[in-house]
């Protein structure tokens, strides 16, 4: 037997350590982009030291490792990502890109973990930063991530962030969204879907991110698929660079301004909040008041100075009918059902491109 042989578990640990070190080297091989650094002060976001309202889009083309990417829309998104798409995002008027990243693909104990996937995520984020965008990296546990681990944040998300946080710790132009849409249902749902359970899951992730040396702004999604924020507890952050994320999707109890005030709006008056995901899906929800809801929500977010990240730039029939080379979805002559091309693409593009808007 080779005198330098190591037990299998030790060899595995050494390989993971070298893989992580290699990824960090790739990130630091060139200076981090100086522009687009994000911080929080009071209840507002700052970009390069100036008050900022995010205007962003989601990218889902790196939501799962390649071999675990399923579904026509996600496969299309994966294949079309590149410099041409990023230039289209710029022309759309966005200044921030949100990447959904697989929890399982980033968790060394997961069956779908892949060091190559982490390199791919890092390369995509670097490309966006080099193009001048601020970035959000969001850990996703839902089915499109390659495994269905929907529910509340737990040790899986913490392990994923111990892999991810060191990769982005040197660039404050990258915000870290800890866990996409804590949910009351799913394989990893908790017995109690409440704020104490939420805090018990989120705080260890905050600690892991800061222990990795990351000084980035941290974003924490609220309860009920990230729709609820009012009464959210504070999380302990030694850097006080912590903010909240809301996903204000249409629901029966979430249709008018009074609902929005009660569920997240009043909270946003005293806490930094960003809407990191939003859209209207006329293939699933087509009540007569949905177009009014969509227009009203955009105006509401603007009035509250809450940034908006539209989902998703690379997924068909959301912002664009097919892809970024073709027409935007529209609220004119709304159609319902699986073949609907209706949506808020034109609405959001108009907001993002209007220089008179904040």
Question: What would you call each of these model-derived segments?
Answer:
Residues 15-28:
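Bacterial N-terminal signal peptides
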Residues 33-96:
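N-terminal carbohydrate-binding accessory modules
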Residues 42-48, 84-91, 124-126, 164-166, ...:
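Short amphipathic alpha-helices and their capping/turn segments at secondary-structure boundaries
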Residues 39, 67-79, 154-175, 179-357:
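Extracellular glycoside hydrolase catalytic/binding regions
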Residues 150:
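Short acidic-hydrophobic catalytic motif
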Residues 81-142, 154, 209-212, 293-304:
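Aromatic-lined substrate-binding rim segments of carbohydrate-active enzymes
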Residues 1-11:
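N-terminal secretory signal peptides that target proteins for export/translocation
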């Amino acid at each position: 037997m080779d005198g330098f042989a190591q037990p299998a578990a030790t060899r595995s640990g050494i390989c993971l350590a070298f893989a992580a070190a290699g990824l960090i080297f790739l990130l630091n091989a060139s200076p981090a982009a100086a522009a687009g650094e994000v911080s929080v002060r009071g209840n507002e976001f700052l970009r390069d030291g100036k008050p900022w309202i995010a205007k962003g889009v989601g990218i889902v083309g790196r939501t799962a490792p390649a071999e675990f990417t399923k579904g026509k829309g996600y496969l299309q998104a994966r294949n079309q990502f590149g410099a041409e798409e990023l230039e289209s995002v710029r022309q759309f008027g966005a200044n921030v890109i949100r990447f959904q990243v697989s929890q399982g693909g980033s968790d060394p104990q997961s069956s779908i973990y892949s060091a190559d996937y982490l390199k791919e995520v890092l390369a995509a984020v670097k490309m966006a930063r080099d193009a001048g965008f601020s970035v959000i990296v969001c850990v996703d546990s839902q089915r499109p991530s390659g495994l269905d681990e929907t529910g509340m944040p737990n040790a899986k998300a913490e392990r994923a962030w111990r892999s991810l946080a060191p990769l982005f710790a040197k660039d404050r132009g990258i915000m870290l969204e800890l866990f996409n849409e804590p949910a009351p249902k799913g394989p990893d749902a908790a017995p109690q879907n409440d704020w104490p359970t939420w805090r018990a899951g989120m705080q260890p992730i905050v600690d892991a991110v800061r222990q990795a040396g990351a000084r980035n702004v941290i974003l924490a999604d609220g309860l009920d698929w990230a729709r609820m924020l009012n009464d959210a507890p504070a999380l302990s952050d030694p850097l006080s660079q912590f903010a909240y994320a809301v996903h204000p999707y249409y629901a029966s109890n979430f249709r008018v301004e009074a609902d929005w005030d009660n569920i997240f709006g009043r909270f946003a008056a005293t806490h930094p909040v960003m809407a990191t995901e939003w859209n209207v899906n006329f293939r699933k929800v087509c009540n007569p008041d949905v177009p009014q809801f969509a227009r009203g929500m955009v105006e509401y977010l603007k009035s509250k100075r809450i940034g908006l990240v539209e989902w998703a730039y690379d997924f068909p029939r959301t912002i664009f009918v097919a892809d970024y080379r073709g027409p935007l979805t529209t609220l004119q002559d709304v159609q319902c059902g699986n073949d609907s091309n209706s949506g808020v693409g034109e609405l959001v593009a108009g907001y993002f491109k209007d220089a008179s808007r904040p």
